[in-house]
Curated annotation (Swiss-Prot):
The gene is uvrC. HAMAP family: UvrC. One of its GO terms (molecular function) is DNA binding. Interacts with UvrB in an incision complex. Keywords: Cytoplasm, DNA damage, DNA excision, DNA repair, Excision nuclease, SOS response. Belongs to the UvrC family. This is UvrABC system protein C. It is found in: Cytoplasm. The lineage of its organism: Bacteria, Pseudomonadati, Pseudomonadota, Gammaproteobacteria, Pseudomonadales. One of its GO terms (cellular component) is excinuclease repair complex. PROSITE patterns: GIY_YIG, UVR, UVRC. GO terms for biological process: DNA damage response; nucleotide-excision repair; SOS response.
Length: 608
């Protein structure tokens, strides 16, 4: 592909019809995707001789080819644009980080004593789904509230089925003990019904009903029941006082965008059935100068068009307007089969909602930029400490975690001047090395990481930080030499004799270049932060791997118990601990387990 782009020749043949354009660089890499009412007019604006913002000019300088697709109308253009952005994620587009599917509160319907839980993903199980909520934290807050007020169980079914006495939740008055029959199905069903009323946003009607019940219980001289209902009403009133968005039963999303030279933030508040489900901050990637309206338009398009499973409210309240909002509404209606209203000029309570979202976006962006500056300052201090010409842009740190050689896991964490790059974090399950040999484990992890780098996978770090001192530093040198990786700064970190933070010894590139930094050095604080994050990431991976291995390793010794039976047994009893407590008769009642096999399992589990 030619690196010289003839804009005049291209524009001479460009159509004036609606469509989508794609800009590529000299290596055929997609740089940017856009849509236009008139392709010719929109593309001509990129190639004018003056007036371009610096970042936009940088994009134009890289253009080697432009491809266009004509569409029937603007709505089709917007839908195609969102599809291409989601598929290719071009670096110069405003990009919304790809999130997990939004969580729901799930109420099982097939159980005599239904369970409330957090649910993500496809809605395959029979039951009711409430939400979606903007974050798992918002769901946990609601579940915690429901557990306090109505004591509906949240334990796993396998755990519930195998209880012989009430658990701690019963002792602290967060559950009525349905697992051991301490509450009747009828009374429990009433608690479930009240929970559903709350989740549906009917908290006022629920409070009225509970008040009536409280008065009736008092008249019957059932003061214990009256006190229980009084406490439930008090919890509901506190929730209502905390939620300033009463005054309707509608479904509304309030979305506010803020853009500064340092970045952008979009704050979303979700209201369903007149009840606030929660809020969330988004920080879109903005590669070229964009007006706040453009950022908001891009966010709304990607948020509601690229994720069909997301709940669509009846109304959006926004803090800025854009001429393409009617096109967006049309595209959403076509893609989702439902229309929504976008409101900008609002009054009264709705104006307060709007301002609340703006304030939250401003504060979140301010905090993020302040933290970014803090981390960037530490990167500059590190460059000064290592006598580098400029601050590094990518720093990777490796660590090893195991329990006496069991379930060894290596971690790789990545930091840049903006903070941790968690999407680039990696874990490596170490296999085929002597138990407890940290050097061999590090050799394997580094070999796997940099072999993939040589194959074109991932980015080269500026600095490789290795926790473990001289020995691990030598191992890193060996791997880099074996793979012919050059131009990489090695930094080894060894804890002092007392292992106290601030007394670390550092090694630059080899063991002969040993030095220390003052305990109050920002550069040392950065090294400690990254090392501790690598340790955290390694140990959580190790614990998960060890737990999985320990859950199955004992059962692997039983002839006739394969992987499927092991999973079924653990699921039936709720874990290895409960399985170990089971008698032979209880084991024989599990699906697919004969009396003879139950005796064998019991013998293995109770052997010395």
């Amino acid at each position: 592909m030619s690196a010289v782009f003839d804009a005049s020749a291209f524009l001479a043949t460009c159509s004036n019809r609606p469509g989508v354009y794609r800009m590529f660089d000299a290596e055929a890499k997609l740089l940017y995707v856009g849509k236009a009412k008139s392709l010719k007019k929109r593309l001509a604006s990129y190639f004018r001789k003056s007036g371009l913002a610096p970042k936009t000019a940088a994009l134009v300088a890289r253009i080697a080819q432009v491809e266009t697709t004509i569409t029937a109308n603007e709505t089709e253009a917007l839908l195609l644009e969102q599809t291409l952005i989601k598929e290719w994620r071009p670096p110069y587009n405003i990009l919304l980080r790809d999130d997990k599917s939004y969580p729901f509160v799930f109420l099982s319907s097939e159980d005599e004593y239904p369970r409330l839980s957090l649910h993500r993903g496809a809605k395959k199980r029979k039951g009711r789904y409430f939400g979606p909520y903007p974050s798992a934290g918002a769901i946990r807050e609601s579940l915690n509230l429901l557990q306090k007020a109505f004591l509906v169980r949240q334990c796993e079914d396998s755990y519930f089925r195998n209880r012989t006495r009430p658990c701690l939740q019963y002792q602290i008055k967060r559950c009525k003990g349905p697992c051991v029959g301490l509450v009747s199905p009828e009374e429990y069903a009433e608690d479930v019904r009240h929970s559903v009323m709350f989740l549906e946003g009917r908290s006022n009607a629920l409070a009225d009903e509970l008040n009536v019940g409280m008065e009736q219980a008092a008249m019957r001289l059932d003061f214990e029941k009256a006190a229980e209902l009084r406490d439930q009403v008090a919890i509901l009133r506190r929730v209502q006082d905390q939620q300033s968005m009463e005054g309707g039963n509608g479904d509304v999303d309030i979305v506010a965008a803020i853009v500064t030279p340092g970045g952008a933030c979009v704050h979303l508040i979700s209201v369903r059935g007149g009840r606030v489900l929660g809020s969330k901050n988004f920080f879109p990637q903005v590669a070229i100068e964009e007006e706040v309206g453009e950022v908001l338009l891009a966010f709304l398009g990607q948020y509601y068009l690229s994720h069909q499973e997301r709940d669509l409210p009846a109304e959006l309240i926004v803090n800025v307007t854009h001429e393409d909002f009617p096109v967006l509404v049309s595209a959403i209606a076509e893609a989702r089969g439902r229309e929504l209203e976008i409101s900008y000029r609002v009054r009264g309570t709705r104006a307060r909602w709007q301002q609340l979202a703006v304030t939250n976006a401003e504060q979140a962006l301010g905090a993020r930029l302040a933290n970014r500056q803090h981390v960037a300052a530490r990167f500059e201090a590190l460059a000064e400490a290592l006598d580098l010409a400029e601050p590094p842009q990518r720093l990777e740190c490796f660590d090893i975690s195991h329990s006496s050689g069991e379930a060894t896991v290596a971690s790789c964490v990545v930091f840049g001047p903006e903070g941790p790059l968690k999407s680039d974090y990696r874990r490596y399950n170490i296999e085929g090395v002597t138990a407890g040999d940290d050097y061999a484990a590090m050799h394997q992890a580094l070999t796997r990481r940099f072999s993939r780098l040589k194959d074109g996978e991932g980015k080269m770090p500026d600095i490789l930080l290795v926790d473990g001192g001289k020995g691990q530093l030598a191992m890193a040198q060996e791997v880099l030499q074996e793979l012919a990786v050059a131009g990489l700064i090695l930094l080894g970190v060894a804890k002092g004799v007392t292992r106290k933070p601030g007394l670390e010894t550092l090694y630059l590139n080899d063991a002969s270049h040993e030095f220390t930094l003052p305990a109050d050095s920002p550069a040392l604080h950065l090294i400690q932060q990254i090392r501790d994050e690598a340790h955290r990431f390694a140990i959580t991976g190790h614990r998960a791997r060890r737990g999985k291995a320990r859950r199955t390793s004992t059962l692997e010794d039983v002839p006739g118990v394969g992987p499927k039976r092991r999973r079924d047994l653990l699921k039936h009893f709720g874990g290895l601990q409960e399985l170990s407590r089971a008698s032979i008769d209880e084991l024989a009642k599990a699906p697919g387990i004969s009396k003879k096999l139950a005796e064998q399992i019991y013998a293995v589990l109770h052997s010395e």
